[in-house]
């Protein structure tokens, strides 16, 4: 019955910003999720790209706005403004590149500087299809996630491994249901605010 009530509510939008060093696979993860495809030709993201997708969960439907940021240093100054109003940050590293893993601490710090501690952060070790070239163990990823109090998953955008699971876990952590209920409460308060304004008039005048 509560699901039926949700149909009247506008589709909730959540902004997810993808962060990480250059060539860790941010764009590839988004492309795999959006189109279930993978492009072997590497093209660096210039500035910021934006894509949007509706996601159907068990108890609600939401719209994810995916912001793909460039990893290059020259675009770094653009990123804080995109982090500022995000609901979640996906911080990606390449399991075959230990430097990209070390840099995730800085990216997570940037997110918390702009958004405070209430933002959802997912640490993602990408490129598990290159396991023979692995420089960062899954245990190291899990340890860092625990230390920094963030979520963690390993993925392969190329093989499609855990990509849907990544987005499902982030979506499940979003404050969708609470926000929807708060919205309804706000609407109810708005209605109540109009009634008290009428009451003093009827009490002060004739009781019609």
UniProtKB/Swiss-Prot annotation:
Q: Which GO terms describe its molecular function?
A: GTP binding; GTPase activity
- Identify the residues that bind GTP: 23-28, 39-40, 42, 45, 71, 126-127, 129, 156-158
Where are the bilayer-spanning segments? none
Q: Where is this motif: Switch 2?
A: 69-88
Q: Where is this motif: Switch 1?
A: 32-50
UniProt enzyme class: hydrolase
PROSITE patterns, A to Z = RAB
Please state where this protein is localized: Golgi apparatus membrane
Provide the Gene Ontology terms for cellular component: cytosol; endomembrane system; Golgi apparatus; Golgi membrane
Q: What regulates this protein's activity?
A: Regulated by guanine nucleotide exchange factors (GEFs) which promote the exchange of bound GDP for free GTP. Regulated by GTPase activating proteins (GAPs) which increase the GTP hydrolysis activity. Inhibited by GDP dissociation inhibitors (GDIs).
Gene name of this polypeptide? RAB6A
What topology does the record note for this protein and the membrane? Answer: Lipid-anchor
Q: Which organism is it from?
A: Gallus gallus
**Keyword Membrane on this protein?**
yes
| Name of the protein | Ras-related protein Rab-6A
Which reaction equations make up its catalytic activity? GTP + H2O = GDP + phosphate + H(+)
Name the residues where the record annotates lipidation as S-geranylgeranyl cysteine: 206, 208
What keywords sit in the KW lines? Acetylation, ER-Golgi transport, Golgi apparatus, GTP-binding, Hydrolase, Lipoprotein, Magnesium, Membrane, Metal-binding, Methylation, Nucleotide-binding, Prenylation, Protein transport, Transport
Instruction: Name the domain of life.
Output: Eukaryota
Checking InterPro entries in the record gives: P-loop_NTPase, Rab, Small_GTP-bd, Small_GTPase
Query: Which residues are recorded as binding Mg(2+)?
Result: 27, 45, 68
Annotated positions of the N-acetylserine modification:
2
Q: Which CDD domains match?
A: Rab6
Q: Identify residues that carry Cysteine methyl ester.
A: 208
């Amino acid at each position: 019955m509560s699901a039926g009530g949700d149909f009247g509510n506008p589709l909730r939008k959540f902004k997810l910003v993808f962060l990480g060093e250059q060539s860790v696979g941010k764009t590839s993860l988004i492309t795999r999720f959006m189109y279930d495809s993978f492009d072997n030709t590497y093209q660096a993201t210039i500035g910021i790209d934006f894509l949007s997708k509706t996601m159907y969960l068990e108890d609600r439907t939401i719209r994810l706005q995916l912001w793909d940021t460039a990893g290059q240093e020259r675009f770094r100054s653009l990123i804080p403004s995109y982090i500022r109003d995000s609901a979640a940050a996906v911080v990606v590293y390449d399991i075959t590149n230990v430097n990209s893993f070390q840099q995730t601490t800085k990216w997570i710090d940037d997110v918390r500087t702009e958004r405070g501690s209430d933002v959802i952060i997912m640490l993602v070790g990408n490129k598990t299809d290159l396991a023979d070239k692995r420089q960062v163990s899954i245990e190291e990823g899990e340890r860092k996630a625990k230390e920094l109090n963030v979520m963690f998953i390993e993925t392969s955008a190329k093989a499609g491994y855990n990509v849907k699971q990544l987005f499902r876990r982030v979506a499940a952590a979003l404050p969708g249901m609470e926000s929807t209920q708060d919205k309804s409460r706000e609407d109810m308060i708005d209605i109540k605010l109009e009634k008290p304004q009428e009451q003093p008039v009827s009490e002060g005048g004739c009781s019609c």
